[in-house]
């Protein structure tokens, strides 16, 4: 009698362990990266609703400071802070801030998609105009700061940008 009961507990334990492994394995398979640039074809995520500017109209990118963080908002209707957006190659992009007495810096590292590929450093009275030139998907750092602030620059954000051919 004890032998059968022990066997029942063992088979139930094995079945439960198998179910747990199966569920966790399928959850890992469905888990996607939160970054668009990690997708196989990030350009396929571009739509008219998330494409900024055109050959005849510049794309404005507003970099603001909010508490201890910074936000990047493209000039797209209903845009959200730090959202992924697209720009067609050849489009003029204007980096600016709508915050008074605020500076900003944008860094693409060693592979900037813009011409000129100098660091993008500006402020409330100094917009920076560049031209999108190198197609691809880019993760970049953006930060904002107040002149004379005790804690200096805000925490950077890590938004993404696709330059379309």
Regions flagged by a language model, labelled:
Residues 2-14:
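Bacterial N-terminal signal peptides that target proteins for export
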Residues 13-23:
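Bacterial N-terminal signal peptides
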Residues 25-29:
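Sec/Tat signal peptide C-region and signal peptidase I cleavage site
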Residues 31-45, 49-52:
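N-proximal, low-complexity, solvent-exposed accessory regions that precede a main structured/catalytic
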Residues 48-92:
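N-terminal edge beta-strand
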Residues 97-103:
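Short proline/glycine-enriched turn/loop motifs at strand-loop junctions of beta-rich domains
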Residues 103-113:
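Short, surface-exposed beta-strand/strand-loop-strand elements in extracellular ectodomains
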Residues 118-165:
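Extracellular/periplasmic metallocenter environments
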């Amino acid at each position: 009698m004890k032998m059968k009961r022990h066997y029942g507990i063992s088979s139930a334990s094995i079945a439960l362990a198998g179910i747990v492994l199966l569920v966790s394995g399928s959850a890992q398979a469905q888990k996607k990266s939160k970054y668009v640039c990690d997708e196989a074809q990030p350009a396929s995520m571009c739509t008219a609703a998330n494409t900024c500017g055109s050959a005849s109209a510049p794309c404005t990118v507003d970099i603001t400071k909010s508490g201890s963080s910074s936000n990047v908002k493209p000039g797209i209707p209903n845009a959200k802070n730090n959202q992924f957006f697209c720009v067609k190659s050849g489009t003029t992009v204007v980096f600016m801030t709508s915050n008074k007495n605020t500076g900003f810096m944008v860094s693409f590292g060693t592979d900037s998609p813009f011409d000129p590929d100098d660091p993008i450093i500006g402020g409330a009275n100094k917009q920076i105009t560049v031209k999108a030139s190198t197609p691809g998907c880019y993760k970049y750092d953006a930060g904002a700061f107040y002149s004379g602030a005790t804690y200096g620059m805000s925490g950077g954000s890590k938004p993404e940008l696709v330059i379309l051919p």
